[in-house]
Amino acid sequence: MKNLNKFVSIALCSSLLGGMAFAQQTELGRNPNVRLLESTQQSVTKVQFRMDNLKFTEVQTPKGMAQVPTYTEGVNLSEKGMPTLPILSRSLAVSDTREMKVEVVSSKFIEKKNVLIAPSKGMIMRNEDPKKIPYVYGKSYSQNKFFPGEIATLDDPFILRDVRGQVVNFAPLQYNPVTKTLRIYTEITVAVSETSEQGKNILNKKGTFAGFEDTYKRMFMNYEPGRYTPVEEKQNGRMIVIVAKKYEGDIKDFVDWKNQRGLRTEVKVAEDIASPVTANAIQQFVKQEYEKEGNDLTYVLLVGDHKDIPAKITPGIKSDQVYGQIVGNDHYNEVFIGRFSCESKEDLKTQIDRTIHYERNITTEDKWLGQALCIASAEGGPSADNGESDIQHENVIANLLTQYGYTKIIKCYDPGVTPKNIIDAFNGGISLVNYTGHGSETAWGTSHFGTTHVKQLTNSNQLPFIFDVACVNGDFLFSMPCFAEALMRAQKDGKPTGTVAIIASTINQSWASPMRGQDEMNEILCEKHPNNIKRTFGGVTMNGMFAMVEKYKKDGEKMLDTWTVFGDPSLLVRTLVPTKMQVTAPAQINLTDASVNVSCDYNGAIATISANGKMFGSAVVENGTATINLTGLTNESTLTLTVVGYNKETVIKTINTNGEPNPYQPVSNLTATTQGQKVTLKWDAPSTKTNATTNTARSVDGIRELVLLSVSDAPELLRSGQAEIVLEAHDVWNDGSGYQILLDADHDQYGQVIPSDTHTLWPNCSVPANLFAPFEYTVPENADPSCSPTNMIMDGTASVNIPAGTYDFAIAAPQANAKIWIAGQGPTKEDDYVFEAGKKYHFLMKKMGSGDGTELTISEGGGSDYTYTVYRDGTKIKEGLTETTYRDAGMSAQSHEYCVEVKYAAGVSPKVCVDYIPDGVADVTAQKPYTLTVVGKTITVTCQGEAMIYDMNGRRLAAGRNTVVYTAQGGYYAVMVVVDGKSYVEKLAVK
């Protein structure tokens, strides 16, 4: 087949080139002829089966050559020693309460004589080699009757959230081992109907949650969309993060982002559920949350290791998934479960960082998307799902991905795959991994790539998600971090590597049933089922496992219970390189507005209005518009619009409000310029330092005034008897080195650790761990003695407040693989230096001649009562700044929106934003989208947006659209202009 529009690269691991051959069967189809003939609500359903693609494979047995039959989606559930006779299953929606029955309406068959059907090897686990398991003929081969007997049966009913279902099984192959007669049913028509008896596992329904409609349509042949009235229409439902107490303070950024992108997310501390935390308590809590009014709990994320939040353990089972199995007594999840397994704050932070970056920061430049890795063992065959070997199985998946649009498929198939093959694939950039083979707690069997190799991964934020079919790769109860945990915690130079999410088993997996689950996961991912489109990792994987349970019954249930999601179950998956969305929104809204309309050129995108991690409304884009209903707005001065879409760049915009005047003055004159590979931001400080420790409002004759009360006119540092020490550096040597300030309050280290006659603090890299012990204070606060320290100031600013007094101090300058220097020129080491109360000592490191040195600036009233926060494209990149300059490294090649916000003790200012556009792209940065004139005492602002004029106390004096005119009384004023969601602030003086 030729495709002139797309080139697909198929790469083979080098170990497979040459010498490899295997028998290639005709690829099996995946669309058996099973169709719905009639459905009258849940009372009567008629279904017809027609045989499709029946094949026979010859195998050697103790009785000679025998036949193993296979057909499309047929599954061998025969016990060991019984004839191998695949069945096929389909799920139906049935009555909520009644017992159901199945009757054969009609059938057609043919018979083959003198056929020896091979005995089943039973359920084979993936820690076994199928070839080494012998064929054993059981007692059934001496019985003169047809097996399995009935050609149509019903399983016990199950409940999937709001629908009761039941599986009808077709057994079209019937075999008499004594007469060696194989009866092949080419067509079977059945009727499934309700009886007058009450059935098992009944459903007491309160209503349906519309977010699962697609799942029902895919799961149940006879499901009728909209036959139930949803209680509440919610696009994404709700997520609860259950977090161990020790990580409660570390989860905020994750929760804020989830709310910002439109998923209502709440936090529950595990120890507040029960102390000690038990699996039963977690299970009961999730059930209670699910049963709350609205019926919208969709995701639960567990944060902590097994010892923090235990898995549910029963004989042969270690399960997180059972926490999501709530309604009925079956193994179908109503809630998607995931886990950030962590043993330290660092473990947790990297999982949070990778998840947020994946959803928020991926751009059209991320060309690694659309590239996939398929890994397979050299085993499997007739007893596996669809009769496929692992290699055949992965080839089916590879073909599916190629048809969907993946541009590169790397195939690593045994024999001979090495860890380097896998490392190279990861480091080259891939977005999806499918693994089918053997496994251990710490490695993949094929390639032997394991936890010891993870440190060699350098795929920083180019993270695939993984569908993993293997034994115990996800056993997080193991004595050391398991394979899945290692991939989720992996870092290189502080940046996430490894994977963004992985589904892996806590126990030994069966050979065949997970293959069916993996097939379905990839089919859902590639949108093969229009009635079951899923965009989250939890949705894709769980729905894939539903197909496994439907076909493999009890074994499928066991596999589902133990197939664990490591990562965020609500993760919005990406498959191909994203494209941009065109989004427009009002520059300003009223706090009293009931809704806001957002235009977007991608239907299905989710648009959300939020502020500081609180969601005020969310809607899906339909016909180019999302109408967001707003609730909960109070006095927010700015709002954030976030729009996410499948395989789209995330769009984040600022929307201003016309609420009460903000007493917290913003920065002004924000600029963005290029210095090498850096974008340098500069701005002017707020006009008045708002010292607002008390912020009250009172009404006088109907005029609302804002009163700012200061505790004292004296600077805080002076009152507390402290001095502020600030260290600032910006890649002085351009080699990754930095600086540390060491402060000795006993002032007895000059001539000891601090040499009096040299600028070498330590002569080599064998640095004692306690070298800095005599120094009571350091900048940064956790400075460590090393030639390559973890904590130093390389590109940025840090400060510490110290009691005023006499100190010895030095500025350490570590050099990798050499020594620890003391910086050269200026006050870089001092004996008995007096730091005065109420003053700020700012050490700015610079290149001076052929060496380095510092400029020391001493100012009164150190410890400003506000700091600056910098945002890039809506994402916070730096906070706690005290300087009016910030350098963003490595960002000069692309356009960005930068915003600066002033954070005061009691509130924050409006953001002021500027567009940075690289040289040669467009010279528009100097063009302000407004004009500002002062004639006499008349201020005139003209723009295509909103304009506001404030006095220096923060009172708004005039506001309007397009043109605002105000007659001033003399003095200083601030003008804010908002155009296309971006804010511009200027100060001016009127004489």
Curated annotation (Swiss-Prot):
Catalytic site positions: H438 (proton donor), C471 (nucleophile)
Top-level enzyme category: hydrolase
Entry binding sites for Ca(2+) 4: E520, E523, H529
Protein EC: 3.4.22.37
Annotated positions binding Ca(2+) 1: D305, F476, E485
Residues annotated as signal peptide: 1-24
Subcellular location(s) of the protein: Secreted
BP GO annotations: proteolysis
GO-annotated molecular function: calcium ion binding; calcium-dependent cysteine-type endopeptidase activity
Gene Ontology CC: one annotated term: extracellular region
Keywords: Calcium, Hydrolase, Metal-binding, Protease, Secreted, Signal, Thiol protease, Virulence, Zymogen
Reaction(s) this enzyme catalyzes, per UniProt: Hydrolysis of proteins and small molecule substrates, with a preference for Arg in P1
Domain of life assignment: Bacteria
InterPro entries: Caspase-like_dom_sf, Gingipain, Gingipain_N, Gingipain_N_sf, Gingipain_propep_sf, Ig-like_fold, Ig_E-set, Pept_C25_gingipain_C
List of residues binding Ca(2+) 2: V327, D330, Y332, E334
Function: Thiol protease. Acts synergistically with RgpB to catalyze the maturation of fimbrial subunits, such as FimA. Its proteolytic activity is a major factor in both periodontal tissue destruction and in evasion of host defense mechanisms.
Identification of the protein by name: Gingipain R1
Naturally occurring in which organism (per UniProt): Porphyromonas gingivalis (Bacteroides gingivalis)
Gene, per the UniProt record: rgpA
